[in-house]
Amino acid sequence: MAGFTDLREKLKSMTPHRDKVFEYSNGEKRKYRESDDDESEYEERRDAEARRVKSGIKQASIFTLEECARIEAKIDEVVAKADKGLYREHTVDRAPLRNKYFFGEGYTYGAQLEKRGPGQERLYSKGEVDDIPDWVHELVIDRLVTHGVIPEGFVNSAVINDYQPGGCIVSHVDPIHIFERPIVSVSFFSDSALCFGCKFLFKPIRVSEPVLHLPVRRGSVTVLSGYAADDITHCIRPQDIKERRAVIILRKTRADAPRLDSNSLSPSIVSPKRRHILKAKRSHRKADPDAAHRPRVLEMDKELQRRSLSSRQRRHDDGSSENSWRRADDREPAARYTHDHAPTRRVKMRRH
């Protein structure tokens, strides 16, 4: 990590020759374009997919600068309340350089369940997250209804994503079995971009060229449906978050969306006592946009070093070395392993 102060710098240094590798949306790879015909075919396929993505996107500039400032002040109030521990347990989800605040409905990511992967996401039980604040209805949702963006009564889930410079969210599709379409988002604090069809990889961290790079301006509304919502992933790249940025995501949950039962939770996050302790510690952490991502990147570097070790060294590992690096977005670090559930494994944690 020496010499790097931001994920964006590490990305740039790790992919100086990325033009030599091209990826199609169906996952096949071709190294080096062998002829003009190959290049033409590649461009045609990329352009065709970009047109399909665009067909499912609508954007509008609805909020004035004054309205943005008022809403941004309310977002700051949400952050302050979360830092004081005033929200319910599952309302707040923290990750390096990105915090999420769930209102109305909250849901687990696949990695928080014993059975992991796409399609395993579940809504929390009713009442597990705080209600949608009145100001979200009055300042945001009602304005979108007035402009015909969404019908009245559509939204029952509001999520605020608060990014610091260099923050990101990996490529994903909003769970189809959880949320109706469209997916509506409103951007605040600064301009950014939404990218479609990226291969977002770690170890080392790198992001491929997107099928479509969609600028999103402060105060703009973005609506995803059809191909853009269901048939291609979208992400926020570290290099596209140059200043603090927040987005309010407004969705409607499906009537038949599955909900959690206690048996579905990973053992490491079941204990109410343990969750209470984590909440108290978490609420007093100070945001440090220059440092919060450093353990994440250092662990990636350590993983590369560990892979170079001989099999003999791995066989004689006494279990006291650090565990393989896990994606920081999967879950809170202190909740990944506990002495109660994994007494023979130990993780060295860094505090800020």
UniProtKB/Swiss-Prot annotation:
Disulfide bonds join C198-C235. It comes from the Eukaryota. The active site is at Y107. Binds 1 Fe(2+) ion per subunit. It is found in: Nucleus speckle. GO terms for biological process: membraneless organelle assembly; mRNA destabilization; mRNA processing; regulation of mRNA export from nucleus; regulation of mRNA processing; regulation of translation; response to hypoxia; spermatogenesis. Coiled coil: none annotated. One of its GO terms (cellular component) is paraspeckles. Residues 18-47, 260-352 are annotated as: Disordered. Residues 272-285 have a biased composition (Basic residues). Its main location: nucleus. Pfam families: 2OG-FeII_Oxy_2. It catalyses: an N(6)-methyladenosine in mRNA + 2-oxoglutarate + O2 = an adenosine in mRNA + formaldehyde + succinate + CO2. Keywords: Dioxygenase, Disulfide bond, Iron, Metal-binding, Nucleus, Oxidoreductase. Its EC number is 1.14.11.53. Its cofactor is Fe(2+). GO terms for molecular function: 2-oxoglutarate-dependent dioxygenase activity; metal ion binding; molecular condensate scaffold activity; mRNA N6-methyladenosine dioxygenase activity; oxidative RNA demethylase activity. Fe cation binds at H172, D174, H234. Residues 18-34, 286-306, 315-343 have a biased composition (Basic and acidic residues). The C-terminal disordered region undergoes liquid-liquid phase separation (LLPS) for the formation of paraspeckle membraneless compartment. Dioxygenase that specifically demethylates N(6)-methyladenosine (m6A) RNA, the most prevalent internal modification of messenger RNA (mRNA) in higher eukaryotes. Demethylates RNA by oxidative demethylation, which requires molecular oxygen, alpha-ketoglutarate and iron. Demethylation of m6A mRNA affects mRNA processing, translation and export. Belongs to the alkB family. Monomer. PANTHER family: RNA DEMETHYLASE ALKBH5 (PTHR32074:SF2). This is RNA demethylase ALKBH5. The gene is alkbh5.
